[in-house]
Amino acid sequence: MGKFFSDSEWTYAPCTYVSENTFVGREPEDAPLPTYEDARDRLPKPVWEGHYDAIACYDKAWQIAFGNLRRPTPGSGFVSNFIDTAFNGCTFMWDSSFILMFGKYGSRVFNFQNTLNNFYSHQHVDGFISREIEEDDGSEKFTRFDPSATGPNVMPWCEWEYYLNIGDRLRIAEIFPPLLAYHKWLHDNHTWQDGTYWTSGLGCG
C-alpha cells in the first residue's frame, strides 16, 4: 500500500473553515509523558467490596493505557502527546475516539483528549481527515476518495462527551472549525441523493 500526505493530491475545492483550524502547522508539544506509577494515586478508584479481581482488571487497563502514551515524532505533523492505538504503528480515528471515552477520567494526570489534535492537524484544505495515519512520518493509508478512507464521524461525539465531563469551553471553540469542515466534507462526499450517509465495512472502524 502506498503512502499519502495531507494536501498532496492534485485537485481540491478548499473549505473556508479549514483556514480557522489552528492545529494545522502548530508546533509539536514538548512535554514529558507521565508514567502509571506516577499517576495511579490520582486516578479514580472504584469502591466495590468483594470484587477485587474486577478492580485489579480496572487497574491493569490504566497501566496498559499509560504504557502506550507517545510523543509526536519530529516531522510527522503530530502536534500533541497521545495514546497509541497499539496495533500497526498508525493512529486510528475510531479507536482513538473510543479509547478517549475512558481516558477522560484520567485527565487530571494526562490530557488524553489531545490525541484527536493529531487528526485535526492533518486536515486537508477541503476538510477531509484520514481515519488512519502513520505515527512515524504522518503519512495516510488511503487517498481521500477511497471508500474506506474516513468516517463515520465519531469525533464530535467523543468531544461532546469530554465537554460534558470536563466543561472545557475553550476546547469546544478550538475544535469547532476543523470538525465543521470535516462534517461538510462528509456531507459533500459520503452521502446518497436522499441525504443518508454511506461508508464501507473497513471504513466503519
Predicted regions and their residues:
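Low-complexity, Ser/Thr/Pro/Gly-enriched N-terminal "stalk/linker" regions
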Residues: 1-91, 114
